[in-house]
Amino acid sequence: MNIKLITVGKLKEHYLKDGIAEYSKRIARFAKVELIEVPDEKTPEHASQAQNQQIMAKEGERIADKIGSRDYVIVLAIEGKQLPSETFSKKMSDITLSGYSTITFIIGGSLGLDERIKQRADMAISFGLLTLPHQLMRLVLIEQIYRAFMIQQGSPYHK
């Protein structure tokens, strides 16, 4: 199994990099992890809606270039479905049993995701209505992926 995480923008915070590296290492015994950062677009301070759409479209093109044609794609979006960890774990297992070898997770930039990327997605999930920095969401997501594997293993990690 392959887990691909496509994100917009470069992660700069060392504490987040360290956490992501730790969980990636833990996941490695279950799946190959690929972390892909695509460049973000600079957003003018008082950008119009049209400018924001153009920015998301450019970022969306970069994301689309990294999605494999046979990937199962899960986007993180505020309007996505909220899942308990156990359900998320079961979904990951079901995806694999359905014949997909790569699950691709996508976290957009500060403006969100281009509509074309959302339409390409097989599933949209949300971690709640709170607004969190997209850099922090990388760590939260990778921890939940690790937790999903631990649930599948019946590990006491998830209590």
From Swiss-Prot:
Its EC number is 2.1.1.177. The keyword Transferase applies. It catalyses: pseudouridine(1915) in 23S rRNA + S-adenosyl-L-methionine = N(3)-methylpseudouridine(1915) in 23S rRNA + S-adenosyl-L-homocysteine + H(+). Its main location: cytoplasm. It is an enzyme of class 2 (transferase). GO terms for molecular function: rRNA (pseudouridine-N3-)-methyltransferase activity. Keywords: Cytoplasm, Methyltransferase, rRNA processing, S-adenosyl-L-methionine, Transferase. It is found in: Cytoplasm. PANTHER family: METHYLTRANSFERASE, RIBOSOMAL RNA LARGE SUBUNIT METHYLTRANSFERASE H. HAMAP family: 23SrRNA_methyltr_H. Specifically methylates the pseudouridine at position 1915 (m3Psi1915) in 23S rRNA. Belongs to the RNA methyltransferase RlmH family. This is Ribosomal RNA large subunit methyltransferase H. It comes from Leuconostoc citreum (strain KM20). The gene is rlmH.
